[in-house]
Amino acid sequence: MDKHFVYIVKCNDGSLYTGYAKDVNARVIKHNNGKGAKYTKIRRPVELVYQETYTTKSEALKREYEIKTYTRQQKLKMIQEG
């Protein structure tokens, strides 16, 4: 069964980026090699600070969208609580 991930990386400027991936580690490497999102390309290096696992892509994408509506403070609280 495939796994789908929603993740948050902390960028070099302190900002947070939320994304979706099937392989989180490979995606973080892409971000750090400048091959990820435009947002992270100019804010490298990035550090993985949070991830959630889902069994379907649909669930993961819904959660990614939800997290992207959160304020920075809500994201930081979620990261802190693990």
From Swiss-Prot:
- Pfam family of this protein, just one? GIY-YIG
InterPro entries for the chain: GIY-YIG_endonuc (IPR000305), GIY-YIG_endonuc_sf (IPR035901), UPF0213_domain (IPR050190)
Which SUPFAM superfamilies does the record cross-reference, listed alphabetically? GIY-YIG endonuclease
Locate the GIY-YIG domain: which residues?
2-77
Q: Which SMART domains match?
A: GIYc (SM00465)
Q: Which family does it belong to?
A: Belongs to the UPF0213 family.
Q: Tell me what this protein is called.
A: UPF0213 protein SERP0126
